[in-house]
Amino acid sequence: MTSLQRKLPEWMSVKQQEDRIDDAKKSFCKKNILEDNLPFMKFNGSIVYSYESNDCSLLSEDIRSSLLEEDVLGFDIEWPPVYTKGKTGKVALIQVCVSEKKCYLFHISPMAGFPKGLKRLLEDESVRKVGVGIEGDQWKLMSDYELKLKGFIELSEMANQKLRCKEKWTFNGLIKHLFKEQLYKRKSYRCSNWDIFLLTEDQKLYAATDAYAGLLIYKKLEGMDAHESDSFRVGREGVADCKGVKRQLTDLSKGLMDLVNQVPNSFGCYTEAVRAVDILEDLSEKLEELRNIMKEASKAEGNGLHFQNSEDCSKKDKSILHVACKESLAEHKMDCKNADSQNNKDIDSCQNENRDEDFFMTLGISEEELYMMEREDDKKQTNPDYKLNKDSCDTNEEKDMSYVIESDEDFDSEIIKSLEDLDNSTEEALGTGVPQAGLIPAKSVDTVADEEEDEGIEEEDDDDDWDPSMPEPSAQHISCLKTYFGHSSFKPVQWKVVHSVLRERRDNLVVMATGYGKSLCYQFAPVYTSGIGIVICPLISLMEDQVLQLEMSNISSCFLGSAQSKNVLQDVKDGKMRVIYMTPEFCSRGISLLQDLDNRYGITLIAIDEAHCISEWGHDFRSAYRSLGSLKRMLPNVPIVALTATASPSIREDITKSLNLHNPQVTCTSFDRPNLYLDVARKTTNISIDLRQFLIKKQQGSGWEFEGATIVYCPTRKTSEQVTAELIKLGIACGTYHAGMGIKQRREVHHRFMRDEIHCVVATVAFGMGINKPDIRKVIHYGAPKEMESYYQEIGRAGRDGLPSCCHALWAQADMNFNRHMLGEIPNKGFREYKLKMLTKMEKYLNSSTCRRKIILSHFEDKQLRKASSGIMGTEKCCDNCKTRLICNISINDTEDNLQDFGPQAYKFISAVDVLGQKFGTGVPVLFLRGSTSQRVPDRFRNHSLFSSGKDQTEAFWKVLARQLITEGYLQESSGQTKFSTICGLTSKGSNWLIKANNEQCPSLLLPSNNELCLQRTRVSNFSSAQAHSSMVPHASSNTRSSMPKAGPEKMELKDKFSYQEAERLSKAAGVSKSSFKLQTPCKLSRPPEPEVSPRERELQTTLYGRLVVARQKIASERDILPAVLATNKVLVDMAKLRPTTSENMKKLDGVSEAKSAMLAPLLEVVKEFCIANSLKVDVFSGSVSQSESTFFTPREQERISLPESQRMSYSLFQEQNLSLKKIADVRCLSMAVVGMHLWQALKAGYSFDVQRAGLTPEMKKLITYAIKKPPINSDLSSFKAIREYVPANIDGYPIRMVISLLEKEGSSGAQGQPEFPTQKTLIQTEENPKNVSVQNTKHKVTMGKSMWIEKKPTQPATAELEVTKGKALAPIMLASWNEASLDADTEELFSESQSSTTRPRRRLPEWFGSTKGNAATRCIQESKNLGEEKGSFFD
């Protein structure tokens, strides 16, 4: 037998025959404790499952820092089986059990590399690791990862020392011997594919139990005294006599025969049939082992080896472990690891001492049986149905003791879960292939869907109106709301949920955007009813913050979980707590507690926060949530409220079914965050210059600071440290946060940031999990985000207090290349392709010139969730692109102006991709078109007609064009054969276009103007073209912002913001004065107060706000609470505006409860002192003081009523930017009717504009006026609906409302008997009768000023001498409320048959009297009078 041949077990060697006989003798001396009916050992603690490198390192560091000297770790590893000779599976999973209640599973296989934090933990000699066969695990880790495991303790050796024996133990053997239990193991997952992501719940439980068992064994052996050691010694048990064995076999055979008769014909359809088959297989193997034992016993008896008693059997100290002879031969630690060791010589030599290797060779099986096992394994591997059958045997029993560790890449879990199911599907098992180059038809459909997914994004209706079918909250509701929560009213959706719980006792599913107020939906009801509210929350940090806020409002509350250091359980049982928070794991084990509370005190509701964790398709699945479905069965009369900030329709349906909700009320709000301003710009290589634009000068001292709390996200740790260094140079107090830091350092940074000790954190995406800081004003991404899901979550951490906040993204093309390269480290091909698709979508967002809010909302599949907030889209507060369009008067529908034709170039590139067989990335087609001699271009393509056809363009141009074609969906990237390669192929959209282009002489393809694309094209254009566009190139090439920071809201020069095409528009709009349209910055800490205040008062408000912030920080530090919990920034803003000086007035502020008003009492003194020092009015509440006393208005400003934001924007565009209604409708994505209504509201509020340009022509005005004056209306302006019926249907509603408003104004001024505007004279003074001359001798002109100024120009002196009519001759219509004090004779003649003759002056008549065009009604008015030739208008 050569050295290359497999070693034979010791029991097959002739030299060891005597030892085998002794072993057989020993086997009959031991008491048989290994019965099949032993209870299974189960791990009932929580399982932390980590599959991301950074999280793994963080958790490992946390384990290291929390361990005491006497603590040990239960340790084990898993790897997939490999049955190919010469190959071994790589370690895929590392299990670490820290206590009987917690176990960590680190899934190494999906990680990019071995986590450094975990490596430090395993190589730390001071941290003791225990396990059976752990020495073999050491060599395995050394072989796979060059990691030397240190500080380990071999439990089999420890057991031999304690029990004073020499056995070869296994996990199961020690468990059975020490605890009279057995490990529950099944073939379907013992030797399963441990490298496949995600692990199943059975796999997690199996792996955790192994590490847990090691920890229990160590504690048992460590605490074992001499007496207990003797009781566990091997060989001390009684004799297994012949009669006893025969009796057991007889009973077993009878039981089996009875089972045969009980098997039903339809047993195969039963859900547990597969499990029964597995049990029978295990039983067959056990019987085979038992048969071998009996054969060995017969041979020993034939050789004269008779055993008299137990003393004879225990003469030798050495004994062989017979306890594990009844173990399954396919046990993972026996099969999987042996398969590797037998096929690899080096690993075999390293693992000869491995406990599993040795035990496998001491089994009571023959060489023939070993050969048969190997044949069976080979047969399974060659069977195409093996994988399908194996997967179908896996059960999906839910376990309630594990949860997935949270990560900021929340959506990964959902996608990987779906891809795993896809990989295990029937199609894959049957070998269904995919089209060449990974072009799956379904993806083509997705591409088309992506192309149109941003359609249908519209503004949501105002939700301020209550549902008429739902009663409004009572005075008691409002009183409770104000007393405990500080609010004066509910939001409509909040009251809808609260009313449903209080009155209808109905289940609810609430999908509510961050910052809308989810917590009030479940906190109010138990406080109002004095009942108990149960809140299930996954994050301990969030529970702690919520409890702190409730306690500050005098609401008794607590949280129950492993992190609770206080003894609050007794208070809970006594019914002293109104709101009780608990983890899902605690809830699963505490159902009896909830039943007791409900029976004794009554549970008002059970709220399940972050309910998307229930769904396996959710982005943060936690299996412990699945057990919450039992709550409805145990407490059927308690309403359940499931809340989440994000859930698709499929996830909502899964939540409803999993929780067993009965006819739930489903409430959804939009995902839009209207207070977030979105901005994207290019970054440079100078970090300081890039970030200075977001800084302002400190008011005191030198240096810079951010405008409020700021998070700067960086793609790598190195970048975050570099950014921190640059900010420190600028004098900014900031901290760094990333996974490479120690746990104490990270906690310190988080603590200081939450308490406003530092105002900026520069972090990787690891920062933000569980953060509850509502006053973050800026979120800056210094580097391109990876995908839309994580980007939406990260920017969602800004502005949770409802105040305006900014989200900036600074990126370069190199960031996208880096992200694309990092995706190559993802081992799962399907998941890697999904990530590529998400990266392409993110690149489209960064490059887009359309509304960025619209792109983000289009990512959500639910139309209700995709709706934008009313009045935000198209305004300067929406995003940088919308702001640019407003400044340059660019219509949102002017797409042709923003597109350029790249048809010939696109045809060449797409054809090149097709010619090359769609087998390469974007680089090879570029080399092919450029005629490169690179070896990357196959020689067989060099004679093609397209080869070197693109020399007229630069390599950079072709690369940019390729990215643009991918972004627009004509090309797509998919994973190549290796992890780091990508393949560029045609989508269905690209294929269809190419077919169409082949039949055209000059193909055309309009692509959105892109800075880089146009710039590269310009560089290679002819000299004349370059000269023609030379004025535009500098604008296009300037991708950076101004390097100097600005204290004001303006962020950058206009030319640096525009794309190549938009630069040309800038020159056209250069004549527009900057002062004519003043943009409201979205970065301000507070909205402009209504009505407008004077500049002096605004400046004082800002100063007072700063002092209040300082005072709040002092109070928070004294009380050791978070400043934002004490008082949000919105409360401080309101205090600066309204300046309360008493506790009662303080309570009037929204968000200030009874309890908080007492805590904030010191702020009242700050307000008093400041107002006295600056002579500023205090307690500026409605009705407390007159308007003139509290503000600094001029008389003309008092005439105007403030407008809502949306109406103000439409008015500004129309009046100050001189845009038409159609243009405004295009820019703001509104209908012309809506814009017209905005202008009518502005007119009604006292704002002036040209109504004729707004669509109210003289003919239309005359027609509407006539309809109002004649019966049956009879000048009654109170009913718009009645007037509408008598106006032609082709006239919109807003012109009618404008006429009504004009007539009301005229009537109001006439009733007062005084000029409408006291600063202007409205009567012409004559010598004869200066008091009775009417206003008709003047020309009224509405100018373009801010207020309705009416310019009066006197007519020619000759026409000013009038004979005034007598009072008795005036027409009766003079008494109408909307007429002026005196009208001209022409007007009176229309309504009165007898009219005194007058000498009329030569003057201009209103234009709507002199028209000869129009309908029959208009012509009828003119029959009795020939109007003057000269026409005029009150509104020119």
Curated annotation (Swiss-Prot):
Cofactor: a divalent metal cation; Zn(2+)
Marked site positions, Interaction with DNA: W139, F980
Motif placement: DEAH box: 609-612
Domain Helicase C-terminal span(s) in chain numbering: 690-842
Motif (KBM 2): 1401-1410
Keywords: ATP-binding, DNA damage, DNA repair, DNA-binding, Exonuclease, Helicase, Hydrolase, Isomerase, Magnesium, Metal-binding, Multifunctional enzyme, Nuclease, Nucleotide-binding, Nucleus, Zinc
GO molecular function annotation: 3'-5' DNA helicase activity; 3'-5' exonuclease activity; ATP binding; ATP hydrolysis activity; DNA binding; four-way junction helicase activity; magnesium ion binding; manganese ion binding
Motif KBM 1 per UniProt: ranges: 4-16
Binding residue positions for ATP: M512, A513, T514, G515, Y516, G517, K518, S519
Cofactor, how bound (note): Binds 2 divalent metal cations in the exonuclease domain; in human Mg(2+) and Mn(2+) give high activity, in mouse Mn(2+) and Zn(2+) give high activity. Binds a Zn(2+) ion in the helicase domain.
Location of the Helicase ATP-binding domain: 499-665
List of residues binding Mn(2+) 1: D76, E78, D210
Region (Disordered): 427-473, 1029-1049, 1388-1411
Keyword flag Metal-binding: yes
InterPro entries: 3'-5'_exonuclease_dom, DEAD/DEAH_box_helicase_dom, DNA_helicase_ATP-dep_RecQ, Helicase_ATP-bd, Helicase_C-like, Helicase_HTH, HRDC-like_sf, HRDC_dom
PROSITE patterns xrefs: HELICASE_ATP_BIND_1 (PS51192), HELICASE_CTER (PS51194), HRDC (PS50967)
Family: Belongs to the helicase family. RecQ subfamily.
Protein name listed in UniProt: Bifunctional 3'-5' exonuclease/ATP-dependent helicase WRN
